[in-house]
């Protein structure tokens, strides 16, 4: 496990949020011209990457296979008075997500996937683009 994952969860949540504010959002705005109205994060953990999108008015959905991480994400979002939907599941078991997302984040996830090619092909089913 990486050292940054062993920090207190609130601190890690805040670091993720700051990284998104400093890098993800400016990058997305530069290359697309605007922010999407919906953002999905697969392997969202505590939801820190999604917080800045929620603060800017995006609908955010976080999926993580670990129910404990989803509970932490829900609690952090309540503390920050932000709305977000968090689901404990394998992303590809959720049929209602097809063709709904202009932006899908998979930060620090793909290295844990055995069949990466199939994993990425499956994203065509849930992305708008």
Question: Positions of the model-derived regions?
Answer:
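A short His-aromatic
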Residues: 108-112
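A short glycine-rich, Lys/Arg-flanked "PGG" loop and its adjoining helix->strand segment in the class I
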Residues: 117-129
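Conserved N-terminal segment of class I S-adenosyl-L-methionine
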Residues: 1-99, 103, 107, 120
């Amino acid at each position: 496990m990486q050292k940054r994952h062993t920090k207190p969860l609130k601190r890690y949540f805040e670091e993720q949020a700051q990284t998104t504010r400093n890098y993800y959002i400016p990058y997305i705005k530069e290359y697309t011209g605007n922010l999407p109205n919906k953002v999905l994060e697969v392997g969202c953990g505590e939801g820190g990457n999604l917080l800045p999108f929620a603060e800017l008015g995006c609908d955010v959905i976080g999926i993580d296979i670990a129910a404990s991480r989803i509970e932490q994400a829900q609690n952090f979002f309540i503390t920050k008075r932000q709305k977000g939907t968090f689901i404990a599941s394998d992303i590809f078991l959720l049929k209602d997500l097809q063709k709904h997302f202009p932006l899908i984040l998979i930060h620090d996830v793909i290295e844990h996937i055995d069949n990466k090619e199939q994993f990425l092909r499956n994203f065509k089913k849930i992305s708008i683009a």
